[in-house]
Amino acid sequence: HIGANTDVPAGDIGVGGREIGFMFGQYKRLRNEFTGTLTGKGLDWGGSPLRPEATGYGTCYFAQEMLATRGESFKGKTVAISGSGNVAQYACEKATQLGAKVVTLSDSSGYVYDPEGIDADKLAYVMELKNIFRGRIREYAEKYPQATYYEGQRPWSVKCDIAMPCATQNELDGDEAQTLIANGCICVAEGANMPSTPEAIKA
């Protein structure tokens, strides 16, 4: 059911380079071949440089082009990002590099709001927390007291210029889209797969 010319599985929520590596190892063992059958492998197993960064960075570059149509850029903008996995981490990194201030990250339990911004050092902590220790985003607020954790909520009520849903499908609904618009959001850049509901798109 899988193969370079059939179906090429990729990582997703809870499935990163480690898990893809496990599956690729078994594929090699069963098929006795080393082909491009799974994407998201580590570099030691034939993975591509910048593969982990590609989606998050690409979301920012796409947003940059959208902003340019209005004569705007990331510089000085406030960004709300959902998620705290691969896509969200690198979207946060690139948005910060482009001059924005990222103020939210989330997971399935809730979101953190850091009015001072999630800079490179704080993001390094998030990457260690999520990628190595498999922790929860609420631990960010325990480490950085200026941040607030909102249990069971999504970050779309936070005032921002740019919203980047980078968590999961249907995470931004029509009411939340209207809230973003009312709060002055000028750009929504989707990093996740189908994160906006049809009602949100129409808003």
What are these regions, as identified by a protein language model?
Residues 39-42, 47-53, 57-154:
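Glycine-rich phosphate/diphosphate-binding loop of Rossmann-like nucleotide-binding domains
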Residues 167-203:
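Rossmann-fold NAD(P)-binding glycine/threonine-rich loop
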Residues 29, 64-69, 149, 169, ...:
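Conserved helix-loop functional segments at active or binding sites
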Residues 3-5, 72-76, 158-161, 179-187:
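Short, surface-exposed connector motifs at secondary-structure boundaries
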Residues 9, 80-81, 162-165, 187-190:
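Short catalytic-loop micro-motif centered on adjacent basic/acidic residues
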Residues 143, 147-151, 156-160, 174-180:
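A glycine- and small/hydrophobic-rich beta-loop-beta segment
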Residues 1-49:
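N-terminal ligand-binding/catalytic initiation module
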Residues 18-22, 86-95, 177-178, 202:
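Short glycine/threonine-rich loop-to-helix capping motif typified by GTGT followed
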